[in-house]
Amino acid sequence: MRLGITAALTDLDVAPDRVAAAVEARGFDSFWVPEHTHLPVREDEPPALVEGVRLDDYKRCLDPVVALSSAAAVTTRIGLGTGILLAAQHDPIVLAKQVATLDHLSHGRITLGVGFGWNVTEARDHGVDPERRWHVVREHLAAMEALWSEEQAEYHGEFVDFGPSWSWPKPVQQPRVRTLVGGGARESVLTAIVAFADGWIPIGGGGLSEAIPRLHGLAERAGRDPADLDIVPFGTIADRAKLEHYSLLGIDEVVLRVRAGPEEDVLGQLDALAPLVPFAATLEQP
């Protein structure tokens, strides 16, 4: 089993390149950062704060592509991922260029974790109808894959429409950068994974014993091999029993959360988690 690290870094915290270098030095396999473009001030719509998440994590979130660019410059081995990027809120042509460039410069180490977002006001500020953001994300990703994989790409949809175009660089990974959908175990999320992604980031990681067979059933009915879908529990508890449980479910990649903060604090958390790396490496899937 491979272990990754995620941290909701802000401009008040240790820089992402410092964390990424420390993650790689301690033997972890990946480094992930989240995204919020902005946090609308709405008294009737407070942020969906969860345990261990600060308001500043939403208000002062770093741009994930820029943050991972700095991480790519100081690492050579670890995977680098967005967890998660709000794809509906981006121009897909620009995002395709950014992600392809990042995959090119990192020599194929990028995972694009995408989601649909909980903050409907944030989505509306980007001109996205929250009720239709699933459809927007699907079109954006399809258009991006065309730009990534075709010499002369074009896409004609409801939300994205462009004629034959050249766009380079192409990502190292083909036909697309590894793409995972983040979210709960709702049928709509699982259907989206099967339709246009390479796997699932189950936020929180609960209920997987029931959800994984459902996902695999949807994949089989759609003509996809369930073994081709990665399942990457995200922000999970750093617990050996939990990792053993995931291994028995056939999961071979887990992302642990550390609290963002000053460099000394974050590196101390990584030191405390580092013994899990060799332990996880001994876990075998059934």
Predicted regions located by residue number:
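Active-site-adjacent structural elements that line small-molecule/cofactor binding pockets in enzymes
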Residues: 1-286
